[in-house]
Structures are given as C-alpha cells and as structure tokens.
UniProtKB/Swiss-Prot annotation:
One of its GO terms (biological process) is peroxisome organization. It comes from Rattus norvegicus (Rat). This is Peroxisomal membrane protein 11A. Its main location: membrane. InterPro entries: PEX11. Residues 218-238 are annotated as: Required for homodimerization, interaction with PEX11G, and peroxisomal localization.
C-alpha cells in the first residue's frame, strides 16, 4: 500500500501506472482478438486503452520541463560518453514531448492546420533517437562493468594461485561462454543498469514499429511497453534503483 501511495503521489509514477494499464490492455486485446465470442471484451479493452492514453496526456504536459531539467543535469556528468549521450538523448526527448503536446492540442481542438501524420512521425523519430542514444549509454556502462568484473576475477585468481577458470580461448564456444558470464555478472552487480537497459530496449520497439524500421504486431508492442512500464514503476518505488549519471 505504501508503494502504491508513493507512486500515486508522483506525476511520473501516475504516468507509468497509466502506461502499464494502457499496454496491458493492448496485449490482452491482441491475445483475445482471434478468439470467438470475445468481441465485447476486446471493445471494452480498446475503449479503456483509449481513455487511459488520453488521460496520460495531462501528466505528460509537464514532462517537457522535466526533460529540460534532465538535460541540464546530464551536462554536469563527469564522464564524456554518458554526458554526450544523455545530453543529446534528453534534447531529443524535449522535442518529442513538444511534438506530443502539439498532437494533444490538435486532438482537443485547441489548434488547427496541423498535419497529424507528419507530427506523429516527427514525434516517433525523436523518441527513437532518444532511446537509441540511451541504449548507447547503457552499452557503454555495461562494457565498463564487464571490464571491472574481469579485472576483479583476474585479481582473485592471481591471489589464490589457482589457474584461470575462464579465458578467452580460441574456440568460439568458450569465448561466448566467457562473454555471457561476464555480462550476467556485470548486470547482476548493477540492478539499476539492468533495469535501464531492459526499459530502453523494450521501449524502442514502439518507434521502430511506428517508423517502419522493424514492424511488430500489437502483442509485441504491448508486451514491450508493459515490461518497460513495470521497470519504470520499480525505479519510482525504489529511487535507488534509478541509473545515475557518472
């Protein structure tokens, strides 16, 4: 109950909760559409999905300011790669939210003469750039942590006097096993990095589908959005699990 109250008291938390509901409806609708006798349920899910999506617009109006603040914070990062990636990513997020606000204004009749399709594609393009740059930052962090895990393991093996248990061998299978083990240990050591990587990877399926770069069905987009929303909710409930800039 305390966790729910904490989420409900934050605009970002409410947005993530609504987003999880929206994508859960999308996923359920995909699973039920092919089943006979479920037409009424599918219609209700579609209506709920539309209502939740409309409700989210009110929370997202303030996200432009939040994205600007995030851009200012990312400029102060000490590591060059995260600073560059996060600054460019957040600038694209600012433009995305501006496009989203224009689309919202068009949908409620506050403005006219707006080409909806053009603005939707513009928003999807900047959302894609934001997520792509965020994933580049995640990859950089993963590689740094993998290097640290490899160095720590080498020190332990050297101090114990035991022969190395894993090495980059000539055989491809052994190399792959060593790489996957390093990756697993790196993400296990750093839950915030794991959550951020999962969230961004699942989210990028949405603009990839919208831009036609990689077409997915409704079920894949709904599942990806749901997983991403749950990961985002976890960071709202437990702020210590949010990935910090170096």
């Amino acid at each position: 109950m305390d966790a729910f109250i904490r989420v409900a008291n934050q605009s970002q938390g409410r947005d993530r909760l609504f987003r999880a509901t929206q994508h859960a409806c999308m996923l359920l609708r995909y699973l039920l559409e092919s089943k006979a006798g479920k037409e009424a349920v599918v219609t209700k899910l579609k209506n709920l999905e539309t209502s939740v999506s409309t409700g989210r617009k009110w929370f997202r109006l303030g996200n432009v300011l939040h994205a600007i603040q995030a851009t200012e914070q990312s400029i102060q990062a000490t590591d060059l790669v995260p600073r560059l990636c996060l600054t460019l990513a957040n600038l694209n997020r600012v433009v995305y939210y501006i496009c989203d606000t224009v689309l919202w204004a068009k949908s409620v009749g506050l403005t006219s003469g707006i080409n909806r399709e053009k603005w939707q594609m513009r928003a999807a393009r900047h959302y894609y750039y934001f997520l792509l740059l965020s994933l580049v930052r995640d990859l950089y962090e993963v590689l740094l942590h993998m290097g640290q895990v490899a160095r720590d393991r080498a020190k332990r093996e050297k101090s114990s006097g035991d022969p190395p248990k894993y090495s980059v061998a000539n055989e491809e299978s052994e190399w792959l096993q060593s790489f996957l083990l390093l990756l697993f240990q790196s993400l296990k050591r750093n839950p915030p990095l794991f959550l951020d990587t999962v969230k961004n990877f699942c989210d990028i399926l949405i603009p990839l589908n919208q831009l036609g770069i990689y077409k997915s069905n409704l079920g894949v987009v709904g599942f990806g959005g749901l997983v991403s929303s749950v990961a985002g909710l976890i960071t709202v409930v437990y702020p210590q699990l949010k990935l910090k800039a170096r």
